[in-house]
Amino acid sequence: MAILYTSEIRDMTPAEREAELEELRTELLNSKAVKAAGGAPDNPGRISELRKTIARIKTVQREEGDLADDE
């Protein structure tokens, strides 16, 4: 999964953003599991990049009204 820029995220449809968000969350979960198990991740900086990309997607969703207030 590639790291996305804000302009790329804004060009996506709400459904595409939601699908991308789920993929990134799954990848982040797997990366954190490897780290917690004591393994060395392939790219240690990837975890922070995943977190930032997830935040970017959620920010755009909030701006465009795609994200409910309770999330």
Curated annotation (Swiss-Prot):
Gene3D superfamilies from the UniProt entry: 1.10.287.310
Q: Name one GO cellular component term.
A: cytosolic large ribosomal subunit
- GO molecular function per UniProt: structural constituent of ribosome
- GO biological process, any: translation
Q: Does the keyword Metal-binding apply?
A: no
| Alphabetical keyword list | Ribonucleoprotein, Ribosomal protein
Q: Which SUPFAM superfamilies match?
A: Ribosomal protein L29 (L29p) (SSF46561)
Give the superkingdom in one word: Archaea
Please give the start and end residues of each transmembrane region.
none
| Cited InterPro entries | Ribosomal_protein_uL29 (IPR050063), Ribosomal_uL29 (IPR001854), Ribosomal_uL29_CS (IPR018254), Ribosomal_uL29_sf (IPR036049)
Assigned protein family? Belongs to the universal ribosomal protein uL29 family.
Name the record gives this protein:
Large ribosomal subunit protein uL29
